[in-house]
Amino acid sequence: MAFPQRFSDLPEYAFPRLRTLLDSHAPGAEPIVMTIGEPQHAFPDWVPGVIADNAAGFGKYPPNDGTPELQAAIAGWVQRRYGVAVDAGTQIMPLNGTREGLFNACIALCPEEKNGKQPVVLTPNPFYQVYAVAALAVGAEPVFVPATDATGNLPDYASLSEDVLTRVAVTYICSPANPQGAVASAEYWADLIGLAERYDFQIFSDECYSEIYRDTAPTGALEMVNKLGADPERVVLFNSLSKRSNLAGLRSGIAVGGPKSIARLKQLRAYAGAPLPGPLQAVAARAWSDEDHVTANRALYQEKFAIADDILGGVQGYRPPEAGFFLWLPVDDAETATMKLWREVGVRVLPGHYLAREVNGVTPGAGHIRVAMVAEKNDMAAGLIKLRDCLY
């Protein structure tokens, strides 16, 4: 039997790869897991009641485009958060998790050719792995652009050659960045949107960590498109309740963009999508409408930022994250450091290069480990102290 080759060169996914590295070795102490970005804070206490009140919806097919209540809740959040008025019926699509949207947007919106050539999809490097798979799925060439200390931990897309830029169809950007915690400034967004206008490509803006920050809410792509008066089709915004509301298991994400782009996403969903079940759409509608639990959740992370700064502030090369809940810590060799932490003190982290691709012999992240600050704060502090004392 013949199988397609388009995904044959994909490296092993980060977490199975980590298990291969560590699981044959006993931890040096009671394990403290700081690998996956799965929030451990409590989700809102009203969630079970909303599911129960809407349980009859499990017997019905859910609407592909989302209930009117969910669409209105998302539009209201976009207006409050970014000051941008969007049409709930034509500019919003609820997603069954943001990863679905980030993947399907490339299928729905990336053209087969750009200027008569194979299209290019740009992605930061390191990056959320779905970006590259989406590019391969549509026959585009993924181009991995370093996002390192030298570039402010965001990709410098303008530095690419004219040959590459004229073929760009889609650009992925993550702000706040996973894994580095860097935030795109208004100036960065303006430059990127200007580049997109000049070379006629779309920006897929992954902003799933936008509600976890220190002091100032990160600027968003949709907000800047509106301020600049750019083409509203230029950007598709993606966000989620996973981090904002500690509802990773709900699988509720959103795509917000121009009517033409959203119409194409909806058309694909009608043929091949899996909408969120009705009772879960009811939970999502309430979550997008409520900011009290988000503010309380952010305060917990702000405490964690302060704890991390206190414990690691004396470590050479430590850079406090601007937002998100990952630490991106410098080490000599990521796998060696990861193994040392596990075998000596039972702290489990992720080698940075597991989230990156090698380009011209260089793999961004090879000198870093990613540490998730998702555990209860005392457990997190204990893990960071062990990490500091073991590695530094």
Feature map (PLM): residue ranges:
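A short, structured active-site edge motif that brings together acidic residues
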Residues: 61-66
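Glycine-rich loop-to-alpha-helix module at the N-terminal edge of alpha/beta enzyme cores
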Residues: 34, 58-60, 73-76
